[in-house]
UniProtKB/Swiss-Prot annotation:
The gene is etc-1. GO terms for molecular function: ubiquitin protein ligase activity. The keyword S-adenosyl-L-methionine does not apply. Disruption phenotype: RNAi-mediated knockdown causes a reduction in progeny viability. ify-1 and cyb-1 accumulate in the cytoplasm during meiosis II. Also extents the length of meiosis II and causes retention of rec-8, a component of the cohesin complex, at sister chromatid cohesion. Causes a delay in oocyte budding. This is E3 ubiquitin-protein ligase etc-1. Residues 658-1001 form the HECT domain.
Amino acid sequence: MIKSLNERDNFLNRLREMEHKREKDEKQEKAARKVQKFWRGHRVQHNQRLLFRAEFDAVSDRQRGLEETIKMAQLLVNFYETNKDEERLVMTLSELVKLKTSDKEFEKRIRETQRLLLARCCIKFLKNATENTIFFHIFRYLEDYVTCHSKLFEASSKLGLFNAEFHLLEALIGKPTGKTVERASLNPRILQLLTRIFETFVNPSRSTSVSVNVANRLLKTICVNITDLNFSNYILYYIKDHIKPTSPNFTNLFEAMKSVDILNNWKVRPEIAETASLRLQSIFVSQIVHVSNTQSEDVKQYFNSLAVFLEHHSKIMRSLNVKEDLSEFGRLRTSVNNHLKQYCEEMLISNEFRRAACIYANLPGVQVETIISLRKYFSQFLDLLAASNTFVEALYAFIARLCPNGEFDPIDAKSPKVNALELFCNCLNKRVSSVADSDFVPTDIFVDFDHTVEFLRDVSIKLIHLMFPTMARGDLYSGNLKEKMYKAETDWKDVTESVFSILGAIYQKDIRLKYFPEEFWTNHGREVLSGIGEHRRMPRRRMPNGRLQIERTMDTEFVERLAAIYEMDSDSENDDEDEDNNLPAVLRRAICVMKHIPFIVPFMDRVKLFTRLLNQDKEKHYTSTFGMGFNGPSVTVRRDQVYMDAFETFAPKMQGDKVNDLKSMVRVKMVNWAGMNESGIDGGGIFREFLSELLKTAFNVERGFFTFTESKLLYPNPTAPFLLGVDCLAHFQFIGRMIGKLIYERQLQEVRFAEFFIAQIFETDKNKDVDLQHMKSFDPIIFKHLKALQKMNNRELDELQLDFSVVTSDMGLVRNVNLKPNGSKFRVTVENVHEYVRLYVNYHLKQRIASMVDAVRKGISEIISIEWMRMFAPHELQIMIAGYEEVFTAKELRKFCELRFAAGTQDINYEEMFWDVIDKLSNDDKKALLKFVTGCSRAPVDGFKSIQPRMGVLVIPSSDDELPTSATCMNMLRIPKYSNRTKLEEKLRYAINSGAGFELA
């Protein structure tokens, strides 16, 4: 059984082997027949070539006429071989060119198929060319018989005409001797060849209509087959110099560049695709040098195409995954590619691009999408864009069309409408900042200025909500909450900051010009600090030590975080980023508003917030001082020497400086003119009077610290250093401390500062120029002259003989001061008159008082953070220091003042008589009354309701001979119950205007 099975297997194996052998023999036989067939064909062709060649030679040896030349052309295409028949080809082509030259109609005797076959011979010839090859007759034939016909040109391009031509070019250029990537000079032979290759694009007299397909093949040859250095050093610059939008066939070449699909149509490897893309981009952007000299439609077409083209190739570059090639060839290619990238960037920031961009931006029907796509390059000369009414109006129309209500979706962060909004704000900002206050005409800035600013104001709030979105409940427990919050903030940051910037610029101008209605900036219908309340609790989080944070209210967290942000240096704003990310969105929004656009919050809301900041600081100071048993400092001053006695105590000193005491409750003891201590214990009222009298003395222009503008506004006296000597800055620093204490205690002082002075005190940017508009309050005549200067022509300015220097006289010391280095050597002309005006204003309103302003600023900052004042505009800071100039009415005072009778029985008639007397007091008497009762002549900024303790009037039974008295620490007026109205009015006026100390108390 087993034996039979083995025999069966052996039999089957033998059958398989025989089958394999038979198949192998059949394949070998077929291969042999194929080789024999090929060999027989080759022998036949070889013999035929020999016969044709012999016949060709016989014909060519005879007298060559028209028929002989045609016969030679017919024979040549049948036997032509490289390295054997080059001379025969050149001879034939030479004869054909001669005949065409002598007889234009001869061309028709040569069939198109015959011409194309000869063109194929030319292509073979060129592919085998060397640097010594004579190419004249080849190109003459191609020009006269092939490329002059569109159909033949396209057919020959399919056969590899461009590859052959550029092979010859590279043979002429030779192997590079170095690796330098730079423009090379073209010798006459190379220039001639390039001109012949590109003849259909550079020679109008010999141009043939070139299809997009032919142009595509030309571009592929240039971008894929040419060696790196030959393209970057020769071909690129030839194309840049010689091919222009006005050149023949440029339209189809341009269309080919736009429509090229490198990855799908050219089908090249990723590393080749990268190089091809960069070469194509460099050719495309090279046209920038010619665009500005073309027709408007050409400019429009170029820029509209450029935006799409660059975006398309940017996607290609991002999609490629090119591995680094560290070979010598790879390093050279990388170097050339980097050069091409730099070349493209340089072209897109060149003066030529700037000129063309200016033309494009001013064309009617400009495509906003194009400039948005190219905003990286257009933004480099934003002044040109901003100057184009056509573009800016089109940009705003684009925004209004896509988001009429200023609504954006979270996914819109990178959308064209958001980019348009950012660009629009930057353009508008450029316009606003370039216009002096005195030349400000809203409709010149933008045709619909008022509505536009209102739109941006409302959009700013919506953008803040997109920067700090309320996360869904599911996100709160996911692991990527911080990433989502960070992404939202990053995505919307640029456009939001642009909106903030333009709103800030317009607001600063509005502060000075009072253009918008008083409530405009806060009339947005949004509660921007919503959710910040005493009773809303912050979510507790775990501290680094593992313990849970103490429960805090949203309001407390907001105030503390805001104080920390104001104190933070600009370069450390993100030090606490992780902690910020843990804040609720509503808190982050509120902080963002107060940090960037506080002016959209109503003034009184900011006053309340500022009070919270002060109270928090006082609480901290109280904890660190009184908590250790410190009861606050006391000072004794003479009533007629309040300023000097206070200066002796609180002036800046190297040792024993008592500046920190000013953050505590200072108790004052007054000594009267007779040298006796005044009665009364300071519960706050005496200090208020002390501070008021001290500052009144400091601001008295007769003391020399300050002087008046023409509008009777105070600013530091430029001659103070000459009057006060070495102690000058110490006095101003001391005055700054007292102003800081005034603000710290929320006390008011009757004083009107020049806005340019108060703005410099609280300005965070020390390099900011003072606007010419401030000169109007400083000296209207000088303001008028400076305005006139800006409108003069060169002849008028030359007659004035002005230079960049001014003459000053300080206490009899006459000096000539240069407004800039060697200023006396520079004449004022039309070109620099604006610079002269700017420097002149800065010198008089800033430079002359700079050291004193810095001293005042330093003094204030020792008591209260200057940064806290950023939430207020200069005119609001004036209110914070001096209150409102309007005098209170009896009705306002009565609402928050309690009147009682010591006897316990109310006398309605007497009460009404008292309030009627108050109502009839003059404004000066009302101020005197308020100072008599509270120690301050101005009502609080936020009204009498904020006075603590509450104001009161106590009517006591007494005789008509007694005078009213007050307890300023209690804000209480004690008034006898006089027998009649006349007596009441007489005694009250006498008491409040007596100027007495606390002897009446």
